[in-house]
Amino acid sequence: PAGITTAIAAAREGMNSVILERSEHIGGLPVNGLGATDIATRGATTGLFGEFVALNREYYRQKYGDKSAQFRDCSDGYHFEPSVAAITFETMIRRTGPGKIEVLLLRQFDAQPKYVIKKGEKITSIRVLNRATGLEEYYTGKMFVDATYEGDLGAAAGVPYKLGREGAGEYGEPCAGKIYRWWKHGPDAEGTTYQGDNAVQAYNYRLCLTNNPLNRRDIPKPDNYTRAELVSLIDDV
């Protein structure tokens, strides 16, 4: 969603944008299963995120009514179905006006320096793969925003970066580094070192769950699935 809101903000300032998305739909985590925002200070909600939340709320109010369980459960728009988030983002893009934002799906950027064309330290164009046609495409712009979770464009362009987490002493942060904590309260648990390491945040699936058999969808087993490679994860769970 960072790329979407960046394009919307630019459109409101009179600029045109192209959103290049690797998958078949835009929206990031909110459109792929993360249907509940966990912001604790809702009074701080403003800007484009505030508009996103308000549109979610209005969707449930109009579709189900303000006395409905669905409207109540949407928690003023902070809780939403992924399909509703997709509708909201599409609405926000459409409201910028014709031609302001072009969305191109199935465009893959491969994180290699040769696919970034620069003039000095400034990116002038990038090469992407059209996954639908298998053809290379080049896009030129005055500014490029890497709004992905991985930051591959920045890395390929030579922007310095660091992997891992800092130790507590590096920047004077008492909650940094390797820490094991008891739930809610208590002293730091055994194994705590406060030291940094090269660990990165785990990837996982954000799935929508249901107890309604009519809403269930089977997950097909991938052709390359090998149970032995994953069975050790059971102990972690």
Model-derived segments and their meaning:
Residues 6, 21-22, 104-106:
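Surface-exposed patches in mature extracellular/periplasmic domains of secreted proteins
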Residues 3:
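N-terminal Rossmann-fold NAD(P) dinucleotide-binding loop
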